[in-house]
Every structure is written in C-alpha cells, then in structure tokens.
Design a protein with these regions (language model features):
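Bacterial Sec-dependent N-terminal signal peptides
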Residues: 1-23
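Non-catalytic carbohydrate-binding regions of carbohydrate-active enzymes
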Residues: 522-529, 533, 537-538, 545-555, ...
Length: 818
C-alpha cells in the first residue's frame, strides 16, 4: 500500500466562496461563543519540557487533560490522512494537526527489530491442557493456564518500558495564527462547520469590521486551505508560528524568504516527519524571523503548510529489518505538494475539494418530518434543549450525516483506516494509545461505509488488514497452533498482532478479532458484487481466517465443537465456548463457504468449513429467557455491561433474526431489556443497531435519543468518555438499519420506523446485491421505493409481512409499492 499524505495550504484572501461550494448549505452546525487558548500546547499543561518517557500519568487521560474545549468545542476537518481541529479563538487561531502515520513504537526503536517482533509465546501446546481441564470441569485450572500463557511481554502503557514498543498515535503539533485582536467590543461571533461542503468557518465583527476565516482539507490536492478575509483592506496583521511534537527532535530553518521548514524525528523510534510553512501576502509587509512568519497590513495572506512522515505500510515485513516500515522521503513529498498547491491557488483548490467531497457526501440524503432547513440555533443550545426533551428532527438528521462526514474526513484510500479517534488527537499519548481496537471499535467505524454509499472509504481498512495477515500467521501458529491468521485486541501501524502483557483475559484474550475483521471483506463484496475484489483481495484473507477458526475449534467427545478457551470481550470469565466466539466463527465460515462457491475454489477446505458449521455449539437460552452469553447459565439479570457481545449474531451478524429465528430473537430482546438503554456512547450506538434488527423502531429511537443526550459532545463527537469516534459511526449505521436492512438476503424497507418519524425520505442507501435504494414514507407508512440495480441480479423486497420478487437488469431502475 502506498501511503497518501498531505500538504496544508492556508490562504487569507478577500472574496466570496466559489459558486460550487455555495450550491448546498443546509447541513451545518455552529457555535456563537469563542473558545479560550487555555488548552494551548495541551501536552502536560503547556510544559512540554516536563515530558519523560517514564512519566506515570498518561497525558491523554481526560481527567488530567486541560483541553476540554478541543474535545467538545473544536471543528474537525480532514481528508483521511491529515486531520485538523479549528478552535476559532479571536486572539489567535489554534489549529491542532495530525498525520495518521505519525506513530511512536514499532521495530525501529533503539532496541531493534528482534525486541519488537520476538514477543509471541509458544503457547499452542497448552491448548489441549486447557481443554482437558474444561473436560474435567476444572474451570479454575483452565483459567489459570490461559492467564499465564496467552499474553506477551509487551505492555500497554508508555511508562512501563523504554523504549515503548507498542507505541501510540501522536500529535503533529499545533499551528497558531495570532491576529492582534481581542474579544473586547466583538459581536456576531460564529464558528461553523458545513457538512455539505466540508468547510469550517469563523466570523465576527470587531470595530465595525467583519472578519471571516474559512478552512478545508482537500483530498485530491493533498492540501488544507484556510482563508482570512475582512470587510476592509489592510486588516490582516498575522503572526504564524508552529509548536512541534514535544517528544521529537528537530530543527526549524528558513525555507526561502517566505517559508519555514521543520524537519524532525520522533525520539522513540526515529520516525522522520517534515512540515513546511510558507507565507504569501498581497499588500502589506512580510518578515521571516525567529521561526515565525509575520504579515502586517495585508489585504490578503496565504500560509502554506505541507506535512508528511517516512512511514510506508508493508504487507510482508522483514522481521530482521528495523526499517521495514520506512519508505517515504517526507522532505521530497512536502516540497512537491507545496509547489503544486501554490500553483493552483485558492479558488481551484476549493473547487477541486468541493467536487471530490460532494461526489461522496451527496450520494445520500435524509429528510425527517420536513426538518431540512431548521438550522436556527447554536449546536450546544440545540443539544441542551434536546436533552430537556425538545423535539429536533433537524438535529437527528444532522447527526446521521455527521457520521458520514467523519468517515469521509478520516478514511480515504491510500492511508491507514480511522483509529479510535478517527484522525484527530491533541496530545503526545492518548486514551488506549489512540490505537486500532479490534474487539468492536475498529469494526464499528466501518458499519456505515457500504450501507450509506461510502464503500470507497472502507478500502483503508482492507489495506490495514493486509498488514496484519503475515504477522498474524505467526501469532496464530505460536499461540493457538492453527493455520491461517488472526490478530488480537489492539493493533498499531507496525503489524502488531500479539496479545499484550496483561493477565486480565477478559480484554486481553481476543483470538477472534481477526475473523471479525475478515467478515468486513465479504460484506464489501456482498454490497458491491466486485468479483475482482473478492478474487484478488478478499478471498485469501477470508480463507485464512476461516482456517484459523476451523482449527481453533475443540472437538468434544459428544460431537459438539466449541471455541475453548474463549471470552466475551471485556466481560466475564474464560469459557469453553463463549457465545460471541461461536457467532463470529459462524459468520466467517458462512462467508468463506459462499466465497469459495462463487470463485470455484478450495472444495476440500469448504467441506471442512461446512462440517464445522454443522457441529458448532448452538445458541442457548437461559433461566430468565435470555440468550446465554457463556456456555453455562451464569448471566446476571442485573448486569448492564456496555458490551453486548453475545448478540453478535443479531448484529452485525446474520444468524439471528425475528424472521428466520424468532425464538432466538426473543431471547436477544430479553438481553437488551436487562442491559438497559444507557452505557457509553459507542455501546448505545451498538444497542441502537440491535434494537433496529429486532424491528422495534420505537425502542431503537429511544436509544438514538439517549445517544444524542448522554453520549454526544457539543461538537457532535461521540464520547466514551473520553472522545471516541466509533459511536458516531455506530449511530449513523443504526439509523440506516431502522430505515432499511438487507443482511438476510432481501431488501427490507422501513423495518424499524419509529412513530416519531411520521414523514420522510432517505435516498441513496446501498443494499446487498449491488442495489441503490430510495425510500419515501408518509403517515408512518411506505409510499414507494425506487431501486437501481447495479449488477442485474434478482431482487426480493419486503415491507411488513409482504414480499415482492423481481428480476432486474443492470443499470435499470424499478419503482416498488405495496
């Protein structure tokens, strides 16, 4: 995979937005109060010199983070590779910068490649001993053996070792544009984010002068652009400065008369990164002294920033080469992007950006109760009113589209997938290292990708999975004695697939993280029917994952196959066959069987997969009517744990449905009723999807309301706490599930429409089979659906209890009424 990185281009010019960017402005949110600069250089309270690698407190912990405005008040923009947050202070614009591959850790630390890679325990021989303990009903022995043998020497906290080999996503620093203004006498302040154009703006009036700023990050041009303008000439008095990542060593030098170059390496792993800055002024004076660019009395000012790292992904890493993930010259790339961006100018960059972004974003439109143009109050006020019980259908459709906006901004082809915080992070270290969490969080990030017509945005996930396969083969063999590949609970960008050092197996033992990830490749094929993708990219990964799952199963003497040992992620004991593990295994085996048949491959393997499906332990219903989470009926009816792993077969899987397995669906409903309607933001997002799969629109709507009220920050980011982006994507996916489902082999229209949404439409959804679907309803009932066939396959459509079947032709549209 060739990493795609970006430049940032900052313009401050007079003039209006281009005509294309003004064509649609309906979806946006805004604040009417500026933020302060109290979070400036948040790392260690503005004292980066206090950083040491042994510091026992993570700077990313929310309770110790003085930068609450960044988390809840900033405006996030991005193009998949670069993320930036706009704080919008009047005195000095503060922009936090991220490049998704700026990571500490990996094989290039001072202890070298062997220190990084030689971490897998040879624990496969213990598997039979654990199973013998289960057979003897000695669960304590089985648990002890698992705890002692299925971890690694790699800690999860940066203070626990030097150098910290797992690493963490880290800030690329902050940019400041001082204005010489104050808030005294200021009025009409507005800081806004348009979802229609992916454009952030700041505007205010000061001393009878109107000031405006505009910000966007272009994917096609690899640039971020910022424009300052005012109602009078000569009002741009700006000082640009840059605060670098404090755990790096570099040098700021002049880059021509009007530019700066920061060339640095991270202290932990010697990763090189470069940031170029230039200033172009029209009118006034420009000086370049002391690492700052100063403009006085200008009518227009342009600041250019380009940023990159030396990281390059590797599908087949050399375990003896510490530089196996090094392959880019950031000095060359930043110079190339800088020159091209300068030559285009602001208007062309904006036009390119808008055309590229709108091509994706405008594919889907949602209208709820004719609330399309109700953007009449600040977003924090809207949320406050909603929390008090006010109806706000505009907010509900805005949040839906915000999830799609975030996916476009944080996941585009050519780079890493969206991590725990997408592509936005304001610190050296962060919550859960801002990593790739493989026991739901990374998967949840991509739940809305195909259904909301953003399938291209899922491609980075598949690139990432391919970086996991080769190292994951070593993990599968050494720990579990299986064929194929898998990964564990947490991954980085350097092919890490092993467990971590903790003996807490409830979270650290996650052998089915790999199979869960692999199901996404089949789903992508099922939505797109891209047979070339299935053959050339997906199949070998799916096959390897299915072989891992098949080999992992314990063949008990009674003829039942169980996943021993296994857990229900982050919850409960080590088990001889947790429901979650069996549900994931069913899913990946079903995927592999179907893929094998389509491609006419691997009949011998397919027979093994089909045999496993016949013998795997069935779902069980417990003493209070619940779908059991473990092989024994030990579920606590008062348990309100955030993870609902045992309902994987209901969602995101396809082995539990009110239509095909009503008894299991009823037992799943009992689980959700007892788990409650609260928990973390992402957990409410998951439950929203599960209630939708149960076809209970009113309860799904209740979860959606709770997500907005209790799991959403003022800038619409999801909160765990702290900020985690997965809940945003889970929420968007859940709303889609309320309005359309296609996972059971047919297009199900309005399967969970709530009473609150009496009238509306959604256009551009994608259904499995390569269909595009528009849905219209009024008075709580379907009026019509319009279906475009992308592959000419047979189509089955369901509404309520009625079903229609039809043959289709590729490229033709069909209107369906019931």
């Amino acid at each position: 995979m060739n990493k795609k990185t970006v430049s940032i281009l900052t313009f401050a010019m007079l003039g209006a937005l281009s005509a294309t960017a003004q064509q649609k402005t309906a979806l946006s949110y805004w604040f009417d109060t500026p933020v302060t600069l109290k979070g400036q250089q948040v790392w260690y309270g503005g004292h980066p010199e206090k950083w040491t690698h042994k510091k026992p407190i993570s700077a990313g912990d929310t309770a110790r983070n003085p930068d609450s405005d960044w988390e809840s008040k900033s405006l996030p923009i991005g193009n998949g590779s670069i993320g930036a947050n706009i704080l919008g202070s009047v005195e000095a614009e503060r922009i936090t910068l991220n490049e998704k591959t700026l990571w500490r850790g990996g094989p290039n630390t001072k202890k070298g490649a062997a220190y990084y890679w030689d971490v897998n325990k040879n624990s496969a021989h213990v598997m039979q001993e654990i199973r013998d303990a289960f057979a003897a009903n000695d669960w304590e022995k089985a648990s002890q053996l698992t705890r002692k043998n299925f971890n690694s020497p790699v800690p999860y906290e940066s203070y626990a070792e030097d150098p910290f080999r797992f690493g963490s996503f880290t800030t690329m620093g902050e940019a400041y544009i001082e204005t010489g203004l104050s808030t005294v006498g200021m009025s009409k302040y507005r800081r806004a984010l348009s979802l229609d154009s992916a454009l952030a703006t700041v505007s205010f009036v000061k001393d009878e002068v109107s000031y405006q700023r505009e910000y966007f990050i272009s994917y096609p041009a690899n640039v971020m652009a910022i424009r300052y303008k005012a109602s009078r000439p000569g009002k741009q008095n700006l000082v640009f400065s840059y605060a670098p990542n404090p755990v790096s060593t570099g040098k700021m030098v002049a880059d021509g008369k009007n530019g700066l170059l920061w060339n640095a390496r991270l202290d932990n792993n010697d990763m090189q990164y470069a940031i170029r800055i230039r200033a172009i002024n029209k009118g006034g004076r420009l000086s370049n002294e002391g690492g700052k660019l100063t403009v006085k009395g200008a009518d227009e000012v342009v600041f250019l920033i380009s940023a990159d790292t030396d990281y390059k992904a590797n599908y087949n890493p050399d375990y003896n080469d510490p530089k196996t993930y090094v392959g880019v010259d950031p000095l060359a790339t930043t110079q190339d992007w800088m020159s091209k961006a300068e030559g285009k100018g602001y208007a062309q960059l904006l036009d390119e950006h808008y055309k590229d972004y709108s091509r994706l974003f405008n594919r889907v439109s949602l209208n709820l109760n004719d609330a399309a143009n109700a953007n009449d109050m600040p977003i924090d006020e809207r949320l406050a009113n909603y929390r008090k019980g006010a109806k706000d259908f505009y907010l509900e459709q805005l949040y839906y589209q915000f999830g799609r906006y975030l996916l476009i901004a944080s996941s585009r082809p050519g780079n890493m997938p969206a991590n725990l915080q997408g592509v936005w992070h304001n610190n050296v270290d962060g919550p859960w290292r801002v990593d790739y969490h493989n026991n739901i969080n990374l998967q949840m990030n991509y739940w809305p990708a195909c259904t909301t017509n953003l399938s291209e945005c899922e491609l980075p996930l598949f690139d990432f999975i391919q970086t996991q396969v080769k190292p994951g083969e070593k993990t599968a063999k050494s720990y579990y004695g299986t064929r194929g590949w898998t990964t564990s609970v947490s991954s980085n960008i350097f092919g890490f697939t092993s467990p971590l050092s903790s003996e807490d197996m409830s979270w650290n033992f996650s052998p089915f993280a790999g199979p869960w990830l692999a199901t996404h490749l089949w789903d992508y094929y099922d939505y797109t029917r891209d047979k070339k993708f299935l053959s050339e990219t997906a199949y070998d990964i799916i096959k390897g994952s299915a072989n891992f799952a098949t080999d992992y199963l314990w063949h008990r003497k009674d003829g039942v196959y169980t996943a021993a040992p296994s857990t229900s992620p982050e919850h409960g004991p080590i088990d001889e066959g947790a429901t979650f593990a069996h549900a994931v295994i069913r899913e990946i085996l079903l995927d592999a069987v179907e893929a094998s048949k389509i491609l006419g491959k691997d009949a011998k393997d397919r027979k093994q997969w089909e045999d496993a499906l016949k013998h795997i332990a069935p779902y069980q219903i417990g003493r209070y009517g619940q779908l059991m989470e473990w092989s024994k009926d030990i579920d606590d009816p008062k348990d309100e744990h955030r993870h609902v792993n045992h309902l994987f077969g209901l969602h995101p899987g396809r082995t539990i449905s009110p239509i095909t397995t009503p008894v299991l669906a009823k037992a799943s409903k009992v689980v959700l009723e007892h788990r409650g309607d609260g928990a973390t933001g992402w957990s409410m997002g998951w439950k929203l999807n599960q209630w939708a799969r149960l076809h209970d629109g009113n309860h799904a709507y209740k979860l959606y309301g709770n997500l907005l009220k209790n799991g959403t920050l003022d800038n619409l980011w999801d909160t765990h706490a702290p900020f985690q982006i997965d809940g945003n994507f889970g929420g968007t996916a859940g709303i889609t599930e309320m309005l359309m489902q296609s996972h059971m082999g047919f297009i199900h229209l309005l399967p969970a429409l709530p009473d609150a949404w009496q009238k509306g439409s959604i256009k551009g959804l994608r259904a499995k089979g390569n269909f595009t679907v528009d849905i219209y309803w009024d008075n709580g009932r379907l009026t019509k659906a319009v279906i475009l066939s992308g592959s000419g396959e047979p189509c089955q459509v369901r509404y309520g209890d009625k079903v229609k079947k039809m043959k289709t032709q590729k490229g033709k549209t069909y209107e369906v009424k019931f």
